[in-house]
């Protein structure tokens, strides 16, 4: 499928929540990442994936965020209980104990939390990954790319439930071209950092068409 393969309706669906509301947001500031719970080799893979997706979007990275220090935090663990031992995490997430309990009860293996600035742009994101057998079965580069794609924009909960954002091309795992095109369009500076009107899907579609 080409970048033009997404219709306005398909684009809108990627940002439509379970309650029917439309919610689009991109990062409103440079991304300053920090990764917990991985070896240096995996850390390099995660940062490489982030650099690639940020470059695709035409966005920026930073060593630190002046307000938060790090504004994209990725936590890799084998058991959700490990989150309770992360220093000061309960200050960033006041309901940490409740979150850990819910993740355990739901047997989840991943969870994402976003925070937003006054303009509605993404201000911070927290990514939690429990490395169960399904997660461990994925190569590190595939796992990293998939997670970064899912925090570069505020997608709907079901955006990639039926079809992953990645595809295999010439033996390599790559971002599906139509998703890459959508990410580029989403970061076009003429578009707002956030939108709650489904008509924004038409603007994204127009930018994708203009880039062909």
Q: Where do the protein language model's features map onto the residues?
A:
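Short N-terminal segments
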Residues: 1-9, 94-102, 208-212
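Long alpha-helical, hydrophobic tracts
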Residues: 1-74, 78-82
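Glycine-rich, aromatic-bearing surface loops/beta-hairpins
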Residues: 120, 124-212
């Amino acid at each position: 499928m080409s970048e033009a393969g997404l219709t306005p309706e398909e684009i809108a669906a990627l940002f439509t929540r379970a309650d029917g509301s439309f919610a689009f947001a991109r990062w409103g500031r440079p991304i300053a990442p920090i990764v917990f719970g991985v070896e240096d080799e995996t850390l390099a893979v995660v940062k490489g994936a982030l650099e690639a997706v940020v470059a695709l979007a035409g966005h920026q990275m930073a060593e630190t965020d002046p307000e938060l220090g790090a504004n994209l935090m990725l936590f890799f663990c084998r058991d959700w209980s490990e989150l309770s031992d992360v220093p000061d995490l309960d200050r960033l997430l006041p309901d940490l104990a409740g979150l850990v309990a819910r993740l355990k009860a739901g047997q989840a293996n991943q969870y994402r939390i976003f925070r937003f600035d006054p303009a509605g742009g993404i201000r911070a994101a927290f990514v939690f990954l429990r490395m169960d057998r399904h997660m461990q079965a994925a190569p590190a580069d595939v796992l990293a790319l998939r997670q970064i794609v899912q925090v570069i924009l505020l997608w709907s909960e079901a955006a990639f439930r039926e079809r992953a954002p990645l595809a295999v091309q010439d033996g390599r795992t790559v971002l599906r071209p139509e998703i890459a095109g959508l990410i580029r369009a989403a970061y076009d500076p003429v578009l707002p950092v956030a939108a709650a009107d489904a008509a924004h899907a038409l603007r994204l579609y127009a930018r994708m068409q203009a880039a062909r």
